[in-house]
From Swiss-Prot:
Protein name (record): HTH-type transcriptional regulator RdgA
Gene: rdgA
Pfam families assigned: HTH_3 (PF01381), Peptidase_S24 (PF00717)
Location of the DNA-binding region in this protein: 20-39
Span of domain HTH cro/C1-type: 9-62
Top-level taxonomy: Bacteria, Pseudomonadati, Pseudomonadota, Gammaproteobacteria, Enterobacterales
Species whose genome carries this gene: Pectobacterium carotovorum subsp. carotovorum
Family matches, as PROSITE patterns: HTH_CROC1 (PS50943)
Annotated function: Regulates pectin lyase production in response to DNA damage.
Protein origin, superkingdom: Bacteria
Keywords: DNA-binding, Transcription, Transcription regulation
GO terms of molecular function: DNA binding
């Protein structure tokens, strides 16, 4: 049974984990334009090539349903495991709180919740339980963080808004010294909430003209917008670990 353009576009978009707004931003159209195609109000589009490139699908398939969804090269790249060759394998060593740090390791605080993280790298002492995670100095150096671990905080992500990339409970590491917004990167942010406390979350950010930010959740169809001046950047997420 032949599918419609609306069905094919939605299939490809959801497979990439993109919202209608995020996809629209990628190709220079509005969220409403993407929605119009997906609900069947537009049976064709002049943006087939741009859509195909960003969704990693064949333009013939997207436009007319002809042939496979993806090229053989893309299919292979999606199927191939991201495991490096054995020559590049590292080693895993068991350690606990009594194990001495190696010369290439530092410890950083592991908080119980993002709510206790401060934008200047401080932590609220009444919550901090003393738990720490270890990072190699090489890892911190690679991402541009301080190699002594200062300014780096870890905590578990909460909620399902960033699934499937960052499921509930995922441990994330944030460099609070890195607040420069790069489109598409993940950040810990704080905004004014309904009460006296600020709402702190992990989100994907995009800058827009007029001092606006698009605040994207992987598991939401509609993005938020806020003035950059109203959003406190706690720091950039540079690492996360998911329990499978």
């Amino acid at each position: 049974m032949k599918t419609t353009l609306a069905e094919r576009l939605k299939t490809a978009r959801t497979a990439q984990g993109l919202s209608q707004k995020a996809l629209g931003d990628m190709i220079g159209v509005s969220q409403a334009a993407i929605q119009k195609i997906e609900v069947g109000k537009a049976s064709q589009t002049t943006k087939i090539v741009e859509l195909s490139n960003n969704l990693r699908v064949r333009p013939e398939w997207l436009a007319n349903g002809e042939g496979p969804m993806r090229s053989s090269e893309v299919t292979r790249s999606l199927q191939e495991p991201s495991i490096p060759p054995k020559s590049e394998w590292g080693t895993v060593s068991a350690w606990d709180s009594t194990t001495e740090l190696s010369e290439d390791e530092v410890e950083v605080p592991f908080l119980k919740d993002i709510e206790f993280a401060c934008g200047d790298g401080r932590i609220q002492s009444e919550d901090y339980n003393g738990f720490k995670l270890r990072f190699s100095k090489a890892t911190l150096r690679k991402v541009g963080a301080n190699t002594d671990g200062s300014g780096v905080l870890c905590f578990p992500a909460a909620g399902d808004s960033m699934e499937p990339i960052i499921p509930d409970g995922t441990t994330v590491a944030v460099d609070t010294n890195n607040k420069r917004i790069i489109d598409g990167k993940l950040y810990a942010i704080a905004q004014e909430g309904g009460g006296n406390d600020k709402l702190k979350r992990i989100k994907q950010l995009y800058r827009k003209p007029g001092g606006l930010l698009t605040i994207h959740s992987f598991n939401r169809e509609t993005d938020e917008e806020a003035y950059e001046s109203d959003v406190e950047i706690i720091g950039r997420v540079f690492w996360y670990s998911v329990l499978l």
